[in-house]
Every structure is written in C-alpha cells, then in structure tokens.
Amino acid sequence: MSYSIGIDFGTASGRVILADTSNGHIISRYEEDYANGTYMNSLYDKPLPENYFLQNADDYLQILEQGVQFVLEDSKVNKNDVVGIGVDFTSSTIIFLDEQFEPLHRHEDLKTNPHAYVKLWKHHGAQDEANYMIQMSKNKNWLDYYGSSVNSEWMIPKILEVKHEAPEILRRARYIMEAGDYITSILTNSNIRSNCGIGFKGFWDNEAGFNYDFFHSVDPDLPKIVKEKCEAPIISIGESAGRLCKDYQQIWGLSQDVQVSPFIIDAHSGVLGVGAIEAGEFTAVIGTSTCHLMLDSRQVPISSITGSVKNAIIPGLYAYEAGQPAVGDLFEYSKNQAPKHIVDQANEHHMHVLNYLEELASHIRIEEQHVVVLDWLNGNRSILSNSHLTGSIFGLTLQTPYEMIHRAYIEATAFGTKLIMKQFEDNHIPVHTVYASGGIPQKSKLLVEIYANVLNKRVVVIDSSNASALGAAMLGANVGNAYSTLKEAALSMKQPIAYIQEPEIQKVQAYKPLYHKYCELHDLLGRQYPELSYLI
C-alpha cells in the first residue's frame, strides 16, 4: 500500500488530497479559500487599475503547510507509505522573489506597490505589451506554435508590464517564476522550472530553449532579464524534481525518499485526472474559466491555439491548449444580475439562484431562443487573443425573459468551444470524444446537454470535482515509483464516469442557425470592428 499527495492551487482556493496510488481513491481532502482573496479593486485602500488581479503568496504557503498536515493526520495512514507529491497551479500566475526566495510584497517598503504582488493568471494589465509582441513578430515564424498570437496573461508580457510600470520591482527581483515553480522549488529547496509552465507561458521550447531573438526584437533588455531571473534547470512532466527537502520532511514527518514532481498547469492536470490521455480526446476543464486541451503525436502550427508543448502532460506527446477566460465567472455574473422576482422565486422553491435559472432555461426550446451573447466579459483568449474585448447581448426585446439571457450565456460558451474545436479539426487533429471536467459539468446537466448538441459530440462527464488535484497526485505516484509510467498511473487512478451525454440530431440541427449568428457577430466585433466592442 502506498499513497501520494496532490496539491491543487486554483483561482480562489487551494485543495490538498491524499490518494491511494493503487486506484486513485481519495482518502482525505482539505480545501480552503485564500485568506487574503484576490486584490482587484484596491490595495491598502488605494484603487487598482481595471483588469488587475493580484494575490498574496503567503496564502499559498498556508494552503501547502496546513493542507498537507491535515490530510496526513485525518487519514491516519503510515507516513512512511507516502511516496510522492504533485503540484498543480493556475497559470500564468507570476511571482517576483528576492535573493532569499522571499516574495517582494513582504518587503515593508513595497507592500503597497501592486507590482510586488503575485500577478494572477487573469491579470490583464499587460495587453499593450502583448500587442507589441505580436506586432514585432509579423513576418516571422516565432509564434507559429503559439497560435500566431501572444496573450496578456502570459509570463513575458507581465514581465514587460513591470519593466514599464514599476522598474524598481524588476531591479529588486532576483527570481521571476510561475507560482507553481515557486511551490516545487520550496518543497525541494532548489531553483527549478517545469517544462509545462515555461513552455506554454514563457516561449521556451524543449529543443531550442528560450527564443532570445524574439525577446531582443521586443526589448533589447529582455534577454538579459530572462537569463538572469527566469533561467533555471527545467524538469519535464513525468520526471522527478527532486526529493522533499529536510525542513518539510521534519514538519510533516515524511520519509526522506518522498519525491516531488515538477508543477503542472491546473487544467493540464485535469486531463490526467479524467484519464483523457489518448489522441482524439478533447478535454474541457470548466471552472471559473475553461481550458481546452488535446494530445497528439505531431506538432503542427494552429492559428489561434495558445500553445503546443512536448512532454507537458504525457511524455512523448504534444499537448495543445486553448481557452476561454470567463465561464463559471460568467454564470456567477448572470446570477448576480438576476432580477428580484427570480431571486424571490428561487428562495420560495428553496433553490440556489443558479439552479433555479437553469431550471427555467431548460424549458426554452432552441427554436424559441432569439438572444445571442458574445461571452467576452473578461476578454477573449481563444481564438482572438484580445483581453480588451467586452461582452455584448443581441436580440433583446421587451418580452425577453431573463432565463433566456442566462441560457444564451451558456450557449455562448458552447459556441466559443466549437470555434476552438474547429481550429483543431481544420488542422487534421480530429476530435472523437469530449471530456467535461471540473465542478460545473457535474452540477449543470443543461450545460452538458447544450455542449453535446452544439459540438455534435459525445460528452463524457467524470465523477470527480477533484480532477486537477487527482492529476497532481498521479504525478506524485509516478515520480514516487508507484508506477513505471505516467500513463499507467493515469489509467489506474482516474475517476469513474458519472454519465455520458450523446448529441440529439434534431437539437444539433436546431443549433446551427444560432451558431452561425454567433460566428457572424464574433467576426464582426472581434475582427472587423473590435473598437466598437471597446466602446461598449
């Protein structure tokens, strides 16, 4: 009998699980919101610019230390049977550290400087830098495997943002890294990087390394910044990042033989958690945002897909990523905008407002739907890569019920996913099955039904809201030698299927006109006249 620990750092909270390596059974689970939350309106009573999303790294250490201690004590397992630890983290979430590996926001003279704090993945303060990087790559092949685009959420635009907005932070930072790398570096007492994070978010290639020609064309100082502050030994997924350091061995009472995996991006970890590890399997990790992932034996340039990296999920295969930056957040927004009579009716029925809205929306026939939404309330990641775009609602009349608008929000996220899927299929990477992971698909059968009919694909819903944490535990099991390959770990430890939603041919046909309208509006306001969206 052996066990592994999976540590999952999400957008607003962290989870730690202890799993049985033989079957993936979760023996103990810890979850806690980040104590300081997310700074998005103000910091120390000073207003923050729009699209700022900052966090405090101390919250991550609290989750790490308290969470691991809790699952070990709660499970009452023999601590000597714990063989490995895996970590997943939202990305690109960037942290700036001093010589002693301390976050700069701990410095008394920097605690009111927003750029000293962790820049959460959905921090969009670097859009101008991203746009400039795209401009400088014109007529070059530098971005072929990044969908010919640069996203403001990625590491390099955020570094440039700090260089332009707070150069003193850049001068005082000795290390700049993904927050996931920060955690694994602390666990192993070493300065290391994961190929998953640095490959997808830092323009690093497993054969060519960093693209310094590209960096120099953007800013002559950038190559030096990356070499001095970002370069470190890079460990691939499936390899060990090293043994757990002595300090944490003593704190938790674990063996000196416990191995630590390099961090994996949280959505990518979800692919492992659901067991979607073969070519042709399309995984949508649906949470506050949605990350779409596929594996293939080939690397081909795909326009508007946000990256492809070898060995980033399964050794030997290329992982492809795309995404939508507001899905669960969009539904939460819709709930908060619900009129009073909807809220009152939900309370009368003793139902959560979101559940009640979905109940009402489920009775709307597709042919009756006359509202189309552009779901860009947090910008657009794929396929337009423009965080300045804003959301729009079309087709409203004085008779439009609110539940029709809510249904249109759900449909818009499905239409956006279909556009992303089309990019893969147009480039000869076929999609056979869609896996829906995350907490939302389990809670919303309406969403799963809409996705199956819009995509015209079978949608497999996995019986686990802990797919990312379980994927991290699989990595821990693999590097801890419970399995000889990561594929074996994923197949043995994956969670069971909750249910399968097949597309219904009549509904598939009924959605085609709505999808066509969505595409027309998408291209009109996203490509031809984006400035109209900026004004809304």
From Swiss-Prot:
It comes from the Bacteria. It catalyses: D-ribulose + ATP = D-ribulose 5-phosphate + ADP + H(+); L-ribulose + ATP = L-ribulose 5-phosphate + ADP + H(+). SUPFAM superfamilies: Actin-like ATPase domain. InterPro entries: ATPase_NBD (IPR043129), Carb_kinase_FGGY (IPR000577), FGGY_C (IPR018485), FGGY_N (IPR018484), Ribulokinase (IPR005929). GO terms for biological process: L-arabinose catabolic process to xylulose 5-phosphate. Its EC number is 2.7.1.16. One of its GO terms (cellular component) is cytoplasm. GO terms for molecular function: ATP binding; D-ribulokinase activity; ribulokinase activity. Pathway: Carbohydrate degradation; L-arabinose degradation via L-ribulose; D-xylulose 5-phosphate from L-arabinose (bacterial route): step 2/3. Keywords: Arabinose catabolism, ATP-binding, Carbohydrate metabolism, Kinase, Nucleotide-binding, Transferase. CDD domains: ASKHA_NBD_FGGY_L-RBK. It is an enzyme of class 2 (transferase). It holds the Pfam family FGGY_N. PANTHER family: FGGY CARBOHYDRATE KINASE DOMAIN-CONTAINING PROTEIN, RIBULOKINASE. HAMAP family: Ribulokinase. Belongs to the ribulokinase family. This is Ribulokinase. It comes from Staphylococcus epidermidis (strain ATCC 35984 / DSM 28319 / BCRC 17069 / CCUG 31568 / BM 3577 / RP62A).
